[in-house]
């Protein structure tokens, strides 16, 4: 019986039948139309941005930021009045020397504008501070001016170096003259009698 049942069944080959492939092609043609949206949704990710913002960047989170109170740098920006001064400097090339000399003589006694503005602005800021804070701020600004005045420091350093070198030269000259005098006295002592040597010692002391 086993042989009879095997003969009734058709033998299947490895290759697909033409009828099965055409039916699958018709089915697959209908599927892409429906599944294009499904495939795109599978391949792409949708982000819930509101949820991400709420999770990672909440409104009450401080991020560890803190306010830093630093003193203002000693930089003096040019104000509106100084723009005219810049224009004047551009035209100085065509200006006559005598006119320039008159302007310099007139401006010699005046204090620079940025210093005047700095003093006015510091007066406004100091009114909000307590006396202790004003004194502390004044001392700080004084120390900062000393620190940033490098030109003066360089001049002082050069003067000190030249003074040290001059002192060293004088010391060397004094040593040379002292050595020369001692050699002269020794030479004179060699040619003299012991009584003359005693007299020279008494004179030198």
From Swiss-Prot:
Modified residues (N-acetylalanine): 2
Membership in a protein family: Belongs to the protein phosphatase inhibitor 2 family.
Keyword Transport part of the UniProt annotation: no
Regions of compositional bias (Basic and acidic residues) in chain numbering: 31-44, 131-142
Biased composition (Polar residues): 17-26, 182-205
Region (Required for binding PPP1CC): 12-17, 43-55
Region (Required for binding PPP1CC catalytic center, displacing metal ions and inhibition of PPP1CC catalytic activity): 147-150
Molecular function terms, GO-annotated: protein phosphatase inhibitor activity
Keyword Acetylation among record annotations: yes
Organism: Homo sapiens (Human)
Modification Phosphothreonine, positions: 89, 92
Assembly and oligomerization: Interacts with PPP1CC.
GO BP: any one term: intracellular signal transduction
Top-rank taxon, per record: Eukaryota
The protein's name: Protein phosphatase inhibitor 2 family member B
Ranges where the record places region Disordered: 1-44, 111-142, 163-205
Biased composition (Acidic residues): 121-130, 167-179
Tissues expressing the protein: Only detected in spermatozoa, both heads and tails.
Function per UniProt: Inhibitor of protein-phosphatase 1.
UniProt xrefs under Pfam families: IPP-2
UniProt KW keywords: Acetylation, Carbohydrate metabolism, Glycogen metabolism, Phosphoprotein, Protein phosphatase inhibitor
Residue list for modification Phosphoserine: 44, 121-122, 127, 130
């Amino acid at each position: 019986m086993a042989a009879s049942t095997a003969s009734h069944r058709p033998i299947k080959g490895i290759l697909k039948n033409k009828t099965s492939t055409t039916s699958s092609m018709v089915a697959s043609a209908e599927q892409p139309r429906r599944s294009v949206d499904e495939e795109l949704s599978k391949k792409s990710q949708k982000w819930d941005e509101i949820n991400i913002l709420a999770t990672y960047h909440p409104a009450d989170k401080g991020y560890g930021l803190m306010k830093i109170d630093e003193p203002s740098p000693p930089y003096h920006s040019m104000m509106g009045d100084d723009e005219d001064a810049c224009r004047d400097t551009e035209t100085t090339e065509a200006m006559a020397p005598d006119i320039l000399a008159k302007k310099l003589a007139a401006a010699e006694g005046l204090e620079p504008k940025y210093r005047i503005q700095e003093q006015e602005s510091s007066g406004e800021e100091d009114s909000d501070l307590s006396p202790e804070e004003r004194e502390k701020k004044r001392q700080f600004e004084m120390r900062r001016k000393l620190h940033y005045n490098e030109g003066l420091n360089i001049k002082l350093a050069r003067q000190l170096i030249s003074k040290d070198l001059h002192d060293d030269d004088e010391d060397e000259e004094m040593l040379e003259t002292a050595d020369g005098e001692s050699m002269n006295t020794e030479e004179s002592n060699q040619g003299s009698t012991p009584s003359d040597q005693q007299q020279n010692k008494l004179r030198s002391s």
